[in-house]
Amino acid sequence: MMPPVRGTLTEGRILADLTWLRVGGPADWLFQPADEADLEQFLAALDPAVPVFPMGVGSNLIVRDGGLRAVVIRLGRGFNAIRIEGDRVIAGAAALDAHVARRAADAGRDLTFLRTIPGSIGGAVRMNAGCYGSYVADHLIEVRAVTREGRAVILPAAELGLAYRQSALPEGCVLTEATFRAEAGDPAELARRMEEQIARRDSSQPTRERSAGSTFRNPAGFSSTGRADDTHELKAWKLIDEAGMRGARRGGAQMSEMHSNFLINTGGATAADLEGLGEEVIKRVFQSSGIRLEWEIMRVGELPVNKE
C-alpha cells in the first residue's frame, strides 16, 4: 500500500521514454511529487523496506529491460526554479544544467561550464559533472535534500564526498536544490563563450543521436598537467579507438563513429544491447592496453525474466 500523495503516483510505469537512450522496463512505482512537502510526507510514510531510486531526466542512465524493483522518484516543475542572489545561484534539482548556465550568464554570473552538460542539476551534483576543466565541486556551496526517512536537510558541499564523476550521497536521499557560488562576468562575453562551447560540442559529439553522453570515465592516474587533482588526461575515446571499437555494433547499439566514447541507440536497441556492447568495449580495451575502463553511465534495474 502506497502513501497518499498530492503529486502523481503510477504503478508499473515503463521508464524507456523517460531516458535519453529510450530503453528500459517498468518501475514498480513512479512518484512525481507536487513539491518538497509532498516528497517529505511520502518518504516519511513509505515502508522503510521499499527501495527508492531518485531519477533525473535520464540523460546518464541505462534502465535494464527487466525494470526497477523500486519507487522511482522523478522531480518536475515544482523543483526547477532558478534564482540569483548576489554571487549565489540557487537552482532546483530538476532545472536543466543548460538553463542554469544561461540564467546565470544573463545575470552576469559565470557557470558557463554547465551549458553543454546534458541533464539536470540534481544529476550534475550527484555525478560531480564537469566540462572544460571545471566541476560542480569547484562551485557548489550546499544542497538541500530530503532523506529516505522524509526529513529536509541542508548538506554542505564538503560533506558530499565529491570526487571525479562521483559523490557519496546517503542511500535514498533525494536532492531538491543546489546553491552555487559563481564569479562575476560580462553577460555578452559569457554568452559568446557558451556559443563557442556549443559549436565545439556539436562538431565533435553525436548530439543528434540518442545517447547518454560520455559512456566511460577517463582513466585515473594518467596526468599531462602535473596537478595532483587532475589525473584523468588519458582519454577513454583514444583507448577505444586503439582497441578497434569505434563504430562497433550490437543489435541497435553502436559506439559512435563521430566520438567513440558515445554509446548510441541507432533505433530499436534494448538495454541489453547497449550494456552488452559497453561490456565488450571494456573487455577489448583491457586486452589492448591493460587498462580497465569504468562506466560513467549509470546502469540500474533487473535483467528481463526468461519465460521459456
UniProtKB/Swiss-Prot annotation:
Pathway: Cell wall biogenesis; peptidoglycan biosynthesis. InterPro entries: FAD-bd_PCMH (IPR016166), FAD-bd_PCMH-like_sf (IPR036318), FAD-bd_PCMH_sub1 (IPR016167), FAD-bd_PCMH_sub2 (IPR016169), MurB (IPR003170), MurB_C (IPR011601), MurB_C_sf (IPR036635), Oxid_FAD_bind_N (IPR006094). Transmembrane segments: none annotated. One of its GO terms (cellular component) is cytosol. Its cofactor is FAD. GO terms for molecular function: FAD binding; UDP-N-acetylmuramate dehydrogenase activity. GO terms for biological process: cell division; cell wall organization; peptidoglycan biosynthetic process; regulation of cell shape. Belongs to the MurB family. This is UDP-N-acetylenolpyruvoylglucosamine reductase. It comes from Cereibacter sphaeroides (strain KD131 / KCTC 12085).
